[in-house]
């Protein structure tokens, strides 16, 4: 056993002997004084152990580290019989209720391990923000006996910190970790309450211990980590912000969320990410990108916009979604073939469906009656079937490479009135292009039509002429090269002769 551990052991024995010694206590005042002295001794012993721990977190021989055990303090409310008492009572810091004035300063700037140890010695609860300096040179942040932080824990722009732990920490405001390039492990096993988790640019963070105790949190932002799972938030049902991005090893993401009141964003994680949001009912804004599979079976209401961009999934099922109060976008989903929006009746923003190369038909809105913004359809689809659509308040731009697409439904309105009320309709297919101008009542004000077949023929003639011109240029090219070479040779000869003569 190392010398310092031997000394610590005998120091502990001495303290215990003091408590176990038969003591005659005549008054409550003397009894409290004795217990306060014992608490002071144990506090200094704890500080001594923490100082050693900050410099040697594990034994050189790899054995168990006794410094990881909690130091138990003497209960100042305990009663000591005058003669019969032979044992003593110890309690954990969890029975403490009073907060020292030194623990209510509002801001604690930690420059080194000594600052942190001093704070722990005084405070089981900290009222204010704890900010770890970018100059903090230790590899370990240990919150020790601190149980509550009525404020934020902020650690940013540090290249030394390897591990952050707080075995007794139960609650805090915001946990902000940003640009910690050596940070690997976070261990808060007792954490139950946190207002915001904001983790960014933690490129080698791979281990987090929170144990799923958190049930209430406002914001979850996890960006640019090496995490393979974030299942420690699975008991959370409602958040304001849920933003998971650029976690390159995250292949599965299950969230038991039922409501997101501001923004839900998942993008740029592992290419094969499977996203399970099966319990989600309502969301304000949602953007999903770079996902291989998605489950949204219970989503019924989107209070703003809904976007699916550059995903790999082949099917998208939202059978309960009735209303989107903003824009609905389906963009650059190369494998998307099957969609189900069977209950959607109202999109109050625009409807954008573009560059989904496997999508042959736009026929998955059987009940859609109204679009509050514009229509933008582009791709290789050959059919548009929106049987219940009665009103589009914006313009319509439709372009397909398929020659089978018929634009008549949009460009030849029944009874002379179009369902498009936004001023302009433009529809292009492999057969023809049509453009209409309409007023707010849907009355056609002007029409223009272009036959793309004739355009192709004209392009063909121009192409032939261009081709002939290029042949002439190709035939004349060798002659031009020969002439240029002859001129250069003559110039070189005259240059040499001139230099010899003069």
Curated annotation (Swiss-Prot):
Where is this gene product found?
Answer: Cell membrane
What Gene3D superfamilies does the database record attribute to this sequence?
Receptor L-domain
The principal localisation class reads: membrane
Signal peptide range: 1-56
Q: Which domain of life is it from?
A: Eukaryota
Q: Which UniProt keywords apply?
A: Cell membrane, Glycoprotein, GPI-anchor, Lipoprotein, Meiosis, Membrane, Signal, Sporulation
Glycosylation site residues: 77, 135, 285, 303, 340, 343, 355
Output the InterPro entries linked to this UniProt entry.
CWI-Assembly_Regulator, Rcpt_L-dom_sf
Specify where the region named Disordered lies, as residue ranges.
441-474
- Lipid tethering residues (GPI-anchor amidated asparagine): 475
Q: Name one GO cellular component term.
A: side of membrane
Transmembrane domains' residue ranges = none
Propiece span(s): 476-502
Family statement:
Belongs to the SPS2 family.
Q: What does this protein do?
A: Involved in middle stages of meiosis. Redundant with SPS22 for the organization of the beta-glucan layer of the spore wall.
Any further remarks? Present with 238 molecules/cell in log phase SD medium.
What is the protein name given in its UniProt record? Answer: Sporulation-specific protein 2
Upper taxonomic lineage: Eukaryota, Fungi, Dikarya, Ascomycota, Saccharomycotina
